Amino acid sequence: MSDLTTIARPYAKAAFDFAVDKGQLDQWGQMLSFAAEVAKNEQMNELLTSSFSAEKMAEIFVAVCGEQVDAHGQNLLKVMAENGRLAALPDVCEQFFILKKEHEKEIDVEVISASELSDEQLANIGSKLEARLERKVKLNCSVDETLLGGVIIRAGDLVIDDSARGRLNRLSDALQS
């Protein structure tokens, strides 16, 4: 975990709480996404590491964002500039979307299989995970032929390794102990 992630959490939480109170989660998500892209820009990155005053930096950043960021979003940008934290905007955006998904009871699940899974198999995996996790599940599927067979499922901190490679590794560990 990077230092910027730790720095970003309180800003993301404040933006998230405000957005929930105002019923503007999607709007804030769009504003933060735009501001994060601006912060990632190479020229803007040079500005963020320059010796401009915090006030001037905030003024420039807000001007670049223009109408994409409302007055409340501009206030967040100004506070972050005053504290020298504009470089953390991409992490603030990421943390905001983590909070948003948690709030909306959604979770991204990575499904890695040895071969392409059928729609029926994916629907079965999705429904079982939704029941177990009590969340709406979004499956991100990929193929890794080195698994030999089976699947690996990653959902947040939960990892289910039901691959042939995983089973062989567990068997090997059991035989060696």
From Swiss-Prot:
Gene: atpH
Transport found in the keyword field: yes
PANTHER family xrefs: ATP SYNTHASE DELTA CHAIN (PTHR11910)
Gene Ontology terms: cellular component: plasma membrane; proton-transporting ATP synthase complex
Compartments reported by the entry: Cell inner membrane
Summary of subunit composition and partner proteins: F-type ATPases have 2 components, F(1) - the catalytic core - and F(0) - the membrane proton channel. F(1) has five subunits: alpha(3), beta(3), gamma(1), delta(1), epsilon(1). F(0) has three main subunits: a(1), b(2) and c(10-14). The alpha and beta chains form an alternating ring which encloses part of the gamma chain. F(1) is attached to F(0) by a central stalk formed by the gamma and epsilon chains, while a peripheral stalk is formed by the delta and b chains.
Gene3D superfamilies per record: N-terminal domain of the delta subunit of the F1F0-ATP synthase (1.10.520.20)
Protein name in UniProt: ATP synthase subunit delta
Membrane topology: Peripheral membrane protein
GO molecular function, one term: proton-transporting ATP synthase activity, rotational mechanism
Family per record: Belongs to the ATPase delta chain family.
Database matches in InterPro entries: ATP_synth_OSCP/delta_N_sf, ATPase_OSCP/d_CS, ATPase_OSCP/dsu
NCBIfam families reported for this sequence: ATP_synt_delta, PRK05758.2-2, PRK05758.2-5
Organism: Vibrio parahaemolyticus serotype O3:K6 (strain RIMD 2210633)
Source organism, top-level taxon: Bacteria
Keywords: ATP synthesis, Cell inner membrane, Cell membrane, CF(1), Hydrogen ion transport, Ion transport, Membrane, Transport
Function text: F(1)F(0) ATP synthase produces ATP from ADP in the presence of a proton or sodium gradient. F-type ATPases consist of two structural domains, F(1) containing the extramembraneous catalytic core and F(0) containing the membrane proton channel, linked together by a central stalk and a peripheral stalk. During catalysis, ATP synthesis in the catalytic domain of F(1) is coupled via a rotary mechanism of the central stalk subunits to proton translocation.
